[in-house]
Regions:
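Long, Lys/Arg- and hydrophobic-enriched amphipathic alpha-helices
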Residues: 250-251, 485
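Adenosyl-5′-phosphate
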Residues: 14, 66-72, 98-105, 115-116, ...
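Active-site catalytic pocket residues across diverse enzymes, especially alpha/beta-hydrolases
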Residues: 175-179, 290, 396
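An alpha-helix initiation/capping motif
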Residues: 2, 21, 138, 164, ...
């Protein structure tokens, strides 16, 4: 805090572009009666605000802004369309509630007695990538190592989330080396679900489970490892506090599991953790970067199911839904900086980069921040270093997908420092439960919601359509959001919607 204030006194708002890290802060200059809000370049830390009669109310959470008596828990048609057709994502500037906005990543805002102005201090720029392949490999390695080194600075013991995937393994390896140099042992943490070995079902989105890869990395690094195993009953029950943590419906049990996991990590004595988010967005780790039939589809690649969503709603729940989604998608594509020399695929990869950065990555970062902070745990994300982002944005796709592999450049950069099974493990997302008890618990909960005539959430859904999913949960062929969210997560999302409408007494206008 002291460094930040001194930097502001020296350089005013020019100080913001000199910062490296994750932050959201406000500076009040009493004499000038000037308030300055600023948010980090990638939006790792949230910052919400709303105009009021004599100024501005703001905070790191939506709840904080809602505490002001002039701010009403009201959503309009855009907010409802966001929840039902884009959720759990939301437009970058939206707080979903009608009066609440989100300060955009890489922006600062200034409030004076005269006016309120919004300014950009960082944005992506398109450049020719001038480094050859060996230099690019070396530079990628250097940037990731330096970002991790910066994030390892801590006054309290630090641990790592370890899934046995490439990204968490790289960070755990770098942290373990740092700890070994001080003759200390790194603690690592992983999450799993009861009976997941029995019920796990592989797919193109989730080709394998984590267990054997975690064991291999723990043996390789010699970390003190902790496993958290979650029960389906606890996972379902935690959907409610997970909604409260976001102050919005979220990623269903992808949220509630992380909430329980973070709480367990905190109880275990850890205060700060490193996590591998964002490498997939930057270096092309997701299937939608590689499947041609998805890559050039004219919609959000992780949420191609607007028709499915509309089919689950009552006919009058939302209007002009498809156009609403399409407009947000196209506006985002138009924001992607491009070069006149970009070919069709290169231009599309730039669009995909910005789509993922502004929407999918933002959703995951919001999830990580809210679930961890609600548990009193600080989670750092070294791959979100803006220098890595800038370098990756202009890197040719052939380099990123080196050897025809997702994140091929990152694999090559760390090939000599990790077991080959880890280096060449196919991308697998955050683990989810496949336990039938969880599906049944969520379906039963939704039935109770639908029996309650006071439920706003229930009034939005076509009960027959949802009932058909309950009868045949396997009928949903692909995720309706991201890589993990299928039929059980539809039920869980309805539960979270119901909780949100009730808890915040939300009105639709």
């Amino acid at each position: 805090t002291e460094v930040l204030l001194h930097a502001y006194l020296e350089w005013k708002t020019d100080a913001f572009s000199r910062l490296n890290g994750i932050f959201a802060f406000a500076i009040w200059e009493k004499r000038e009666r000037r308030l300055t809000l600023c948010r980090d370049r990638l939006g790792v830390k949230p910052l919400f605000f709303a105009p009021i009669r004599n100024g501005l109310t703001f905070g790191s959470t939506i709840d904080t802004v809602l505490c002001h008596p002039e701010i009403e828990p009201v959503i309009d048609e855009d907010g409802l369309r966001t929840l039902l057709l884009l959720g759990p994502a939301r437009p970058p500037e939206s707080g979903v509630f009608r009066q609440i906005k989100s300060l955009l990543p890489g922006h600062f805002a200034v409030l004076t007695p005269e006016n309120f102005t919004d300014h950009v201090y960082w944005q992506l720029e398109a450049h020719e990538h001038e480094d050859d392949l060996p230099t690019t490999i070396e530079r990628t390695h250097t940037l990731i190592c330096d970002a991790a080194r910066r994030q390892l600075v801590s006054d309290v013991p630090l641990a790592c989330f370890l899934s046995g995937g490439l990204d968490s393994s790289i960070l755990s390896m770098l942290a373990a080396k740092d700890y070994a140099a001080r003759s200390e042992t790194l603690h690592t943490w992983s999450v799993d679900y009861r009976d997941n070995d029995k019920y796990f079902t592989k797919s193109i989105f989730q080709p394998n489970s984590d267990d054997s890869y975690i064991d291999q990395m723990v043996d390789f690094l010699g970390t003190h490892h902790h496993r958290v195993v979650l029960e389906p009953e606890a996972l379902c029950a935690a959907l409610l506090p997970a909604t409260d943590a976001r102050a919005l419906p979220g990623m269903a049990d992808v949220d509630s599991s992380l909430l329980l996991f973070c709480a367990a990590v905190k109880r275990g004595g850890t205060t700060v953790c490193l996590s591998g988010e964002c490498a997939d967005e930057l270096f092309g780790g997701y299937p939608w970067y590689h499947r041609e039939e998805i890559l050039f589809e004219d919609t959000f690649p992780w949420s191609r199911s607007v028709g499915l969503r509309l089919g689950l709603l009552t006919p009058d729940a939302v209007r002009n839904g498809e156009e609403f989604v399409r407009q947000h998608y196209r506006d985002t594509c138009d924001r992607a900086p491009k070069l006149s020399s970009d070919g069709k695929k290169a231009a599309r990869m730039r669009e995909m980069f910005v789509l993922n950065l502004d929407w999918f990555m933002a959703t995951l970062l919001d999830r990580k921040d809210r679930m961890s902070m609600y548990s009193g745990l600080e989670v750092r994300v070294p791959f979100c270093d803006h220098r890595i982002v800038e370098y990756a944005y202009n890197m040719p796709w052939d380099f990123k997908s080196l050897e025809g592999r997702e994140k091929g450049i990152v694999r090559r950069a760390f090939a000599d420092e990790l077991p080959k099974e880890i280096v060449y493990r196919k991308k697998s997302p955050y683990p989810k439960t496949f336990h039938p008890v969880y599906t049944r618990l969520c379906a039963d909960y939704v039935r109770r919601i639908f029996e309650d005539n006071t439920s706003v959430a229930a009034s939005l859904f076509d009960r027959n359509a949802v009932q058909k999913l309950m009868q045949r949960p396997e009928s949903l062929a692909e995720p309706w959001f991201g890589q993990l969210m299928r039929t059980p997560q539809i039920f869980a999302y309805i539960i979270q919607l119901d909780r949100w409408f009730r808890h915040y007494h939300v009105k639709i206008v």
